[in-house]
A protein has these predicted regions:
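Noncatalytic carbohydrate-binding groove/subsite architecture in carbohydrate-active enzymes
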Residues: 2-101, 110
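Aromatic- and carboxylate-lined catalytic core of secreted/periplasmic carbohydrate-active enzymes
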Residues: 97-170
C-alpha cells in the first residue's frame, strides 16, 4: 500500500504540474471484496487530494457472479464514510451474463456518473447479443439524464436538463 500511495501521489502531482486541466482518475478498484475494502479504506485518505474522480471496475468472474450495482454502492458508502466527495465512474464494466439494465440503473442510482463498457472485443465473459441490444436501446433512450430518482426497487425516474422526466420499470 505504501508504494502505491507514494507512486500515485507523485504521479498525480507531476501530471497536474505539467497539465493543469488534467482529470486524474483514481486507480481502478477491482470490486469491493473485503480485502479490497480494507485496502481502499486505508489508501483513499492518503491519496484523496490527488485525484478528481473515484472509479470502480466490475469484471464478472468466470462463475458469473454479479454485483447488483457494479460495486458503486460500496465505493460510494466508503467515500462518504471517509468524507471524500468525488464523482464515481465505472471505468471497466463487464457484466457477462448479469442482467444489464438493472445493473446499469442501480449503478447510476447509487452514484455512478459515467459507466464505460469494456466493449464487444474485450477478453472474458461476453454480454449476450440480446443484452447488448437492450443496453444500446437503454443508452439511446436515457443518455444525458442529469438526475436519477429511485421510486421503488424496480422503478426509477430519469430527469433531463430540459425538465422532462422519463420513468423506467426494470
Amino acid at each position: 500500500e505504501d508504494e502505491f500511495v507514494e507512486i500515485f501521489n507523485l504521479s498525480s502531482k507531476l501530471i497536474k504540474q505539467k497539465q493543469k486541466d488534467a482529470v486524474i482518475i483514481m486507480a481502478g478498484a477491482a470490486g469491493m471484496f473485503p480485502e479490497n475494502k480494507k485496502f481502499w479504506k486505508s489508501a483513499l485518505p492518503k491519496i484523496k487530494d490527488n485525484f478528481d474522480v473515484a472509479n470502480i471496475h466490475h469484471i464478472t468472474p468466470p462463475e458469473g457472479k454479479c454485483d447488483k450495482d457494479m460495486w458503486v454502492g460500496d465505493i460510494s458508502k466508503l467515500l462518504k464514510k471517509l468524507s471524500i466527495q468525488k464523482p464515481i465512474w465505472v471505468t471497466e464494466a463487464m457484466i457477462g451474463k448479469c442482467k444489464v439494465i438493472p445493473m446499469y440503473v442501480n449503478a447510476f442510482a447509487n452514484g455512478a456518473e459515467v459507466i464505460i463498457d469494456v466493449g464487444v472485443n474485450a477478453p472474458g465473459m461476453k454480454m449476450s447479443k440480446k443484452s447488448r441490444k437492450k443496453l444500446n436501446e437503454f443508452i439511446k433512450e436515457y443518455d444525458n439524464f442529469i438526475t436519477i430518482k429511485k421510486l421503488s426497487k424496480t422503478k426509477v425516474e430519469f430527469i433531463f436538463k430540459d425538465g422532462s422526466v422519463k420513468s423506467l420499470e426494470f
